[in-house]
Structure formats: structure tokens, C-alpha cells
């Protein structure tokens, strides 16, 4: 990866690392890259969506200036989930899409990610080409004049097309189900409640503000505590928690217990296998998924393929090998039959559909997965790049792996979007995991600070 793009687009503190000027350059270079082979009679068109962060307007203005200066027309979608941009990009006659969001990150952060004409996130190689344009060839991009300059249109109503499509992905109506939805004060604030209501669910919304000052603050998929209590207090059938841009989902059963991405994947994969619609009886996951998921899939006659961490790598594996379900423990789940990226709202609908169709409570469905004990730590460091070269850390990881043997594993990686090292330990002996977490965490902290 280059200097700008991380594992999920360009991220940084808005107006510090991610400025209006950089947004302009990304608009020019990214727009030119996406449309340079366009041969249509009209000007090329790119969609822009955003989450609720207050910095979204500033970055949108920079992107619009960059895109239009490269001769590209822009349609502004307003506040819409990331997967909504992916869906609309693939279904409308446009040449690309851009989403302004930092997903589950803090309010001060923001990000920019691109989608190609088919609604797929760009590959590492494509992003490297855009970086090369920005750093070395920005002035070679043409500056059209007169009527060839791009123009801007606003179409916030296009989100209805996305809502209507989501509704068509399920075959039940949800009447009789009481559902609490935590929109994380983010991009799902309209879409998630609206589609559930159209499916006749009894919907209660929490954290549904769009003012941009509270996105992800003590709410959403990374902080489900308020949702858990609300589900219990309201005697709801289940709860749904999205993150800031609604590309992920975590659920809560009727008892207030969290149903994470692994359990959601288990529920959906086994249901799809039973109905004969899980391609090659295969689920694609990442190293963070619990080994119990592999265990249950194999027990039921399926298999799990593990790829690099990050939903783009899950998608790559799915596209290359014809799989149609994959995702991450965090709740990024891709149903390739329906959308080309992780979609939190769509995923929630598939699970609720299974609840309705089978008549089982969510707790009963989730009980199929009995996770091995796991320890997760996010260790803040100054020099995460040194992880690859530290011999001491490598030695300690090797010792931990030998200690756990076949009944556990160790996974350590540098975050692609934050200054942290992610440490995961998994095994059947929880006491041993805790001891190893303390020891490894301490060594990583000392070595990389």
C-alpha cells in the first residue's frame, strides 16, 4: 500500500491529515482514473455519498471541485450508507462512486473511498495508480474548458431506490416482530428504520440523529450496551446495531445477548446450505473469526476459507472462486447475490427473515455457534511499522503458538486505519490466554513505543 490509502480508502483526522486540498486531489486523480477509458457521448458521471460527520460537507466540496475540474459530472446523494453508494453505482448509468466516511472511527476522523462502475471497492493496485497520479502526474490530468467542465446535481431522493431494493431481498414480511434499531447517529438513520417499517415490523429507533455531532459516540455496532438494555426493557424480539456508515451490523437477541458477525455468518451460512443456495457450501472469513465457525461448518458438511483481514480481501476471494457469502467477525458481511460490498442493513434483513421464516428466536439460532474463548487487545503504539522487523516480538509469538499447540492460535497485525497493533489469542484454556495476552501485550507496547 502507498502513502495515502489504507485498508479501507483514505482515512485521517479531518482538516489535519485529510484536508479539503487532499479531497480535491483525490477527486481529480480518482475521477480521472475511473473515467479515463469512458467512451460515451456524454460526460462521465460519478456519485458521491457521505455519512453524518460535520466534516463531510468540506470534503464533499473538495471532491466535487476535483471531479468537475476533470470534466466529470457529479450527483450528490447526501447522507446514505456506504453500501447504498455501491448499489446505486452498479445499478445506474454512472462511471464510479465515492463515499465520504470513516465508518466506526471517532467523530474527528473522516475518510474517502472509491467504487468502480460495478460498485466494487478498488484493489490495492488501482489505489496505487491513483496515488501515483497525485504525487507524480497530477498536472498531466486535462483541465477541460467551456461546456466540458463537469456540473453538479443533487439527488438525495435516490436513497429510496436503495430502500426498495433492500426490501426485495427478503421473502417474508416482519409483522409481529418488535425490533430496536441503533443507527449510531450515522448514515443508516433513514434507510434502516424505513425498510423495516415497509416490511411491517414494529420499529423503535435509538441514536437516530443526523446532526453529525454524535456519530458512533457510545452507540452503534462497537458499543451495543444501550441497545442491549433497550431490547430487554422494551421486551423486543431483537436489536440491530449499525456503525457510522452502515456497512456492518451487530445484533442483539431477545435476552440482550450480543450476536456478533461470526454468529450472524453461522446463522446465514447454515440456512443457505439447508436451502441449497450457498455456493460450493463455502463461507469466506478472516483470521479474526472464531475457530468454532470452521468447526460447525465442517460438521454440517460445509467448509470455511480464510483470507487476509479486511472485507476487500474477503470480496476478492469470493469473486475469484465463485463464493457468495463471506465476512468478518466485526459484522462486515457480504451477500454477493445482492450487493458488491459489506452491507449492514441488508445483512440484518437476512437474519430477521430467517427468524420470521423459521419461527425460531434469535437466541435459538445463535446457539448453533459455541465460540472458543478469545482475547482481543488493541495496543496503542507510535511505530506500528516496526512490527515486521522486531525479532523479540516474533520470538514471543512463536513461543505462544507452541504453548497453545493445536488447541489455539495467535494473530498479531498492525491496523490499516489506526495507530494500534491488534492482538488476538484463541484457545480452549481461557486462563492461559489471559496470561499470554498480558505478556505479549506488554512486549509489543515496550518494543513499538
From Swiss-Prot:
Q: Which gene encodes it?
A: glmM
An annotated GO BP: UDP-N-acetylglucosamine biosynthetic process
Q: Which domain of life is it from?
A: Bacteria
Q: Which cofactor does it need?
A: Mg(2+)
Q: Tell me one GO molecular function of this protein.
A: magnesium ion binding
The protein here is known as Phosphoglucosamine mutase
Q: What are the EC numbers?
A: 5.4.2.10
> What does this chain do?
Catalyzes the conversion of glucosamine-6-phosphate to glucosamine-1-phosphate.
Q: What is the lineage of its organism?
A: Bacteria, Bacillati, Bacillota, Clostridia, Halanaerobiales
Q: How is it modified after translation?
A: Activated by phosphorylation.
**Which NCBIfam families does UniProt cross-reference here?**
glmM (TIGR01455), PRK10887.1 (NF008139)
What PROSITE patterns does the record tag this protein with? Answer: PGM_PMM
**Positions annotated to bind Mg(2+):** 103, 243, 245, 247
Q: Record's GO cellular component, any one? A: cytosol
Amino acid at each position: 500500500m502507498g502513502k495515502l490509502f489504507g485498508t479501507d480508502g483514505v482515512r485521517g483526522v479531518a482538516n489535519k491529515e485529510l484536508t479539503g486540498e487532499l479531497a480535491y486531489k483525490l477527486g481529480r486523480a480518482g475521477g480521472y482514473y475511473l473515467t479515463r477509458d469512458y467512451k460515451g457521448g456524454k460526460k462521465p458521471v460519478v456519485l458521491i455519498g457521505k455519512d453524518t460527520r460535520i466534516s463531510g460537507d468540506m470534503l464533499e466540496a473538495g471532491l466535487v471541485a476535483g471531479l468537475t475540474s476533470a470534466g466529470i459530472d457529479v450527483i450528490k446523494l447526501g447522507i446514505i450508507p456506504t453500501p447504498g453508494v455501491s448499489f446505486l453505482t452498479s445499478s445506474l448509468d454512472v462511471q464510479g462512486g465515492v463515499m465520504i466516511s470513516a465508518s466506526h472511527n471517532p467523530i474527528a476522523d473522516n475518510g474517502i473511498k472509491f467504487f468502480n462502475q460495478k460498485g466494487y471497492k478498488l484493489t490495492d493496485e488501482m489505489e496505487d495508480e491513483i496515488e501515483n497520479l497525485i504525487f507524480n502526474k497530477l498536472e498531466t490530468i486535462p483541465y477541460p474548458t467551456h461546456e466540458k467542465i463537469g456540473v453538479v446535481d443533487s439527488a438525495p431522493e435516490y436513497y429510496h431506490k436503495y430502500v426498495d431494493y433492500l426490501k426485495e431481498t427478503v421473502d417474508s414480511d416482519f409483522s409481529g416482530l418488535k425490533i430496536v434499531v441503533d443507527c449510531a447517529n450515522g448514515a443508516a438513520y433513514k434507510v434502516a428504520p424505513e425498510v423495516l417499517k415497509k416490511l411491517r415490523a414494529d420499529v423503535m429507533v435509538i441514536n437516530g440523529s443526523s446532526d453529525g455531532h454524535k456519530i458512533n459516540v457510545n452507540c452503534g455496532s462497537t458499543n451495543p450496551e444501550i441497545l442491549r438494555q433497550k431490547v430487554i426493557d422494551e421486551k423486543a424480539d431483537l436489536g440491530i446495531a449499525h456503525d457510522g456508515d452502515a456497512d456492518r451490523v451487530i445484533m442483539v437477541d431477545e435476552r440482550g445477548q450480543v450476536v456478533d458477525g461470526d454468529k450472524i455468518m453461522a446463522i446465514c451460512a447454515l440456512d443457505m446450505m439447508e436451502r441449497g443456495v450457498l455456493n460450493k457450501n463455502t463461507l469466506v472469513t478472516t483470521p479474526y473469526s472464531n475457530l468454532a465457525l470452521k468447526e460447525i461448518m465442517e460438521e454440517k458438511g460445509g467448509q470455511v476459507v480464510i483470507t487476509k483481514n479486511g472485507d476487500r480481501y474477503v470480496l476478492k476471494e469470493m469473486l475469484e472462486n465463485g463464493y457468495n457469502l463471506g465476512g468478518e467477525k466485526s459484522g462486515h458481511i457480504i451477500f454477493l447475490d445482492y450487493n458488491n460490498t459489506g452491507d449492514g442493513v441488508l445483512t440484518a434483513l437476512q437474519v430477521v427473515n430467517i427468524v420470521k421464516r423459521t419461527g425460531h428466536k434469535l437466541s435459538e439460532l445463535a446457539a448453533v455457534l459455541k465460540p472458543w474463548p478469545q482475547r482481543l487487545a488493541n495496543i496503542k503504539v507510535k511505530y506500528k511499522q516496526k512490527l515486521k522487523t522486531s525479532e523479540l516480538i516474533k520470538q514471543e509469538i512463536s513461543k505462544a503458538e507452541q504453548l497453545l499447540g493445536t488447541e489455539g492460535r495467535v494473530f498479531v497485525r498492525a491496523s490499516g486505519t489506526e495507530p494500534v497493533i491488534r492482538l488476538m489469542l484463541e484457545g480452549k484454556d481461557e486462563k492461559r490466554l489471559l496470561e499470554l495476552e498480558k505478556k505479549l501485550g506488554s512486549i509489543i507496547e515496550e518494543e513499538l513505543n
